[in-house]
Curated annotation (Swiss-Prot):
One of its GO terms (cellular component) is nuclear speck. Extensively phosphorylated on serine residues in the RS domain. Phosphorylated by DYRK1A, probably in the RS domain. Phosphorylation by DYRK1A modulates alternative splice site selection and inhibits the expression of MAPT/Tau exon 10. This is Serine/arginine-rich splicing factor 6. It comes from Homo sapiens. The keyword Repeat applies. Pfam families: RRM_1 (PF00076). The gene is SRSF6. Residues 75-103, 176-344 are annotated as: Disordered.
Amino acid sequence: MPRVYIGRLSYNVREKDIQRFFSGYGRLLEVDLKNGYGFVEFEDSRDADDAVYELNGKELCGERVIVEHARGPRRDRDGYSYGSRSGGGGYSSRRTSGRDKYGPPVRTEYRLIVENLSSRCSWQDLKDFMRQAGEVTYADAHKERTNEGVIEFRSYSDMKRALDKLDGTEINGRNIRLIEDKPRTSHRRSYSGSRSRSRSRRRSRSRSRRSSRSRSRSISKSRSRSRSRSKGRSRSRSKGRKSRSKSKSKPKSDRGSHSHSRSRSKDEYEKSRSRSRSRSPKENGKGDIKSKSRSRSQSRSNSPLPVPPSKARSVSPPPKRATSRSRSRSRSKSRSRSRSSSRD
């Protein structure tokens, strides 16, 4: 017997309301109400066709209902399904009948784009309308673009059937256009692939950046350590060099001072000798007094300049000998002169 599906029913609808709604379209054999939908069995198939054609989109208890031909074998309220005309039958649970059809949405790859959709048509209307071609798992309307919807089917055959039979049909006064959504699936796949690649690239970049940072830090630390070591070595070397140069320069200065003092003492000694020899013993007493004073003044003037204590010690012995010798000679000369004057 022909059966008709009624969708988007109000939860307050009763069986009497359904009978009134279908009155005038033949005799009703059975009315089966579910949560939000139901089934009506007609006695004549022509009455069922007329009801589907004229009552689809009409209001019932404040809700715009969908009326369409039911698909699949009939199932009773206990879950038993009766076979078709060829016979046969079996048991099917309610999960596979009602809850599977009208359960939570499931995304699949068998997707159709619905264009030229009426603004009055909601996603529930679109889903209920597309059920006549096959099992609809997901429906959406006016989400991404206005007057455009999305329908996803359980299998490829259901999608192909909807594309062949329902393309160009009228929903709420508009002829819809169905387009198979092939590029979007590939685009989404490539997008997910690019996402995973970009994430892996970001992770690898962050790891490489972290490794480069740690390497640069370790290199900078090793450089700073090597610099500090080189600085310490250079400082120790410079200190050693300074101490060596000081120790070397001190003996040089001492040697130079010794040599200078020796040369000065020798020169002064020779000068005093030559001056004392150049004076003649035949001069008068005045000349002797002058020569004594000159020799003393010259010896005093020729005596070395005041020198630091280290230099004075090294220079002092030779000039004392020279002055003592010159004084002794001058005294001997003065004695000899005084003797000669007394004899005269």
